[in-house]
Amino acid sequence: MRKLWPTLLAFAALSAPAQAEVLEANDVLPPGQSGYVSVQGVASGTGSPHLTDQIGLFSNFEYKPHTFNQPGETEVPRAGVSIVRDSYGVPAITGDSDYDAWWGVGYAVAQDRLFQLELFRRATSGRLSEILGSTYLDDDLIARRDYYTDPEIDSMLAEIPAELRSRGEAYRDGINAWIEHVSQPGNPDLPGEFVALDDLPIEPWTLRDTGRIGVFLARTVPSGDGNELPNALALEAIGRRGFDLLHPVRTKGRLVTVPRSEGRFPAQPGRSRRDERIGARRTRSFLADTDLSTVTDTAAQVTARTGGAPGAGLRAVLPQGGSFMWAIRDQARERAYLFNGPQLGYSIPELFVEFELHSPAQPNLRGVSAAGVPLVGIGHNDQVAWGFTSGLSDEDDLYVEEVTGPETYRFRGEERQMDCRDETFEFRTPPTDFPDLIESQGAPSGSVTERICRTVHGPVQFTGEGAALARRYAIWGRELETIVGLTELNDAQRIADVDRAMRHVTWNENVIAADSNGDIGFWHPGLHPLRPKRWDERLPYPGDGRAEWRGLLPRSKTPHVINPEQGWVTNWNNPPSAGWTNGDGPARERLSGSLHRVRILQSLVAKAARRPSFERSSRIVRRSGTTAQQFPFVDRRKLRRAKRRASGGGPEVLSALLAWNGDYARVDAAGTVDPGVATWEEFKDQLEAILLKPVGEQAAVLAGETGLSHQFDITNGESLALRTLGTRAYARAAQATAASLSARFGSPDASTWREPRRMYEVGAMGAGSSPDLPFFDRGTWEQAVALGR
């Protein structure tokens, strides 16, 4: 009998099911992992060998290993901590204790991104102008006006669980160990920017610094502020019909992530279409009786100074953007495939920093985070992988306060005192010039003091005669709760764990996850206001108490789906589900209906899901990242009919479009792209102009514009024009396109309308220098993961 046991055990080992785990994983982070530039390298933008060593991978759609325990050089910065850096400089940190592990993460991140950490803490505390000059004063004002005081941040940090606070302290201590190291006289590891900007000595890192970065990311990256004020101005200029045409409450034919067969998730349960019609009339009447001219003049002045939306400079350091992701379920083999490409632009260094962690509490964890935040934002452990895209739902509202005095206002029939304080901002002319950070010298050194106020609704953003605009945030004071949910996500072992974690996050980042059992899911979490039923959510509300929120949407009612019958999910910042409304349009592209850019992903992912594999899933980005997303879905019959009808050079324009496959990246021997590229870009612009002409010039703000990450995407106005205009308009647009391109290229021959392929100018968060990247509509960082047995 005893001799039988070894045989039985051996047989059991052979017949046991394979261990569920990460089977394959790869990623790319262009231009590179590091942001370190030496003192000697400031002039040339050089330093670490890992500043730009992933550009070649990205440009050729190649990837580096994203699995655990890659070989590399080992460093032991202190007892209990080891750091192994692979051939691309990505650190894998192992700690004898959880404290040791997170100390090591802080130490390694500081090695790679110490000056970026400095920029992040200054941006989020309103202190950029102290080192970068007076051109950042407006951004510093926004950071202090719309966010929190030091005591408020400290109070929020005191509320997070003790184990997470301990992790933050370990991360802080690791950063400070590196600061102490580089602060030694003559140390060659000191980043050159600190010397060039005379930003010495380096202040110790604090838990408050980490808290401020976490607050900013949770509040701003998922959605940012709303468009109520531009919407109100557009409504006044073009009238109700034009406004409703370009910014409906719901867009017909919109593409959603949760399949309609899997459920409907109303953003405002209990609100009827009749309520919405009454609310639209009521809000228009309120705005007609309210003089916002002096308030809007103030807003316009700030916009002119910042060169864009208020806070544009702040978001250049900590940006907001779009992103894409998908997951495919292989039920037959109990496998799942996930791909994610968060799109936040490209800079040197990137917003994201990559690392791997091994600790007693978290044996295997790998992915990216923002420098300064002690968790893996996006990545995988050995059982679950996950990705994010910006949710872009409307989680804040603008209130028009009835001002009764310099710092008083009326609310619910009573005069109330604003909560006001003085904030002093120091600024100085920087001693050196980094073009991507310091565009002009601005005013010489000095200081200014600003009065910052809040009402019952929130921060007062603009004031005028008799009115003030205050913004109410659903997430106010609760941003750091997201850290709890993301930590649970880091620890998740099954999709059910991800589902539970999503009940704790307060930010509006879409999540798609996959696990080693082959399960997948999608969530659109966050704190979503239940708005007043009979007021228009697209426009400012009266602040006198008539239009208060009814509460928050229950977490169980937010859009989500697990293992949809179709076997896949995908999101490219499109609406999450049926029943969801457009809000004030924090992202205009959400209004583009059936021509939203996600359509190409839905088509490609559905095809790959018929025969699921890691290779098929990973190849999707080669097509979606090089194709003008809407072009494959344009009505080609309408193009042919328009060609027969067109005159002048119109037929040649339409022939060029019909001959093109939508690829904007393939070049000829001269480095130029297909004539269809310039033709398509001009044609849809001309179509939009035809659509907007009878509406009025002010309609342009509602039509929107494409962002740097989506250069070949379409605007809301172009989408509406392509979907609704007829053959005659197509023919007119083609003729206008021919005239424009003939003048631009000096020839009416469409075959000569070839332009150089577009490049993406890599920004800088410091002195680093990077070559431009070939433009693809791809992620700042991309990961592909296969899980199963």
Show where each model-derived region lies.
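Bacterial N-terminal signal peptides
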Residues: 6-15
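Sec/Tat signal peptide C-region and signal peptidase I cleavage site
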Residues: 16-20
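Substrate-recognition/specificity elements adjacent to catalytic centers across diverse enzyme folds
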Residues: 21-337, 342-348, 360-362, 367, ...
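Terminal end segments
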Residues: 47, 51-54, 582-647, 728-789
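Second-shell loop/turn segments in exported
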Residues: 101-105, 150-166, 470-473, 484-489, ...
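Compact, glycine/acidic-enriched structural inserts
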Residues: 120-122, 361-441, 486-489
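Hydrophobic alpha-helical segments
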Residues: 461, 469, 507-608, 679-691, ...
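Alpha/propeptide regions of enzymes that mature by internal proteolysis
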Residues: 482-504, 601
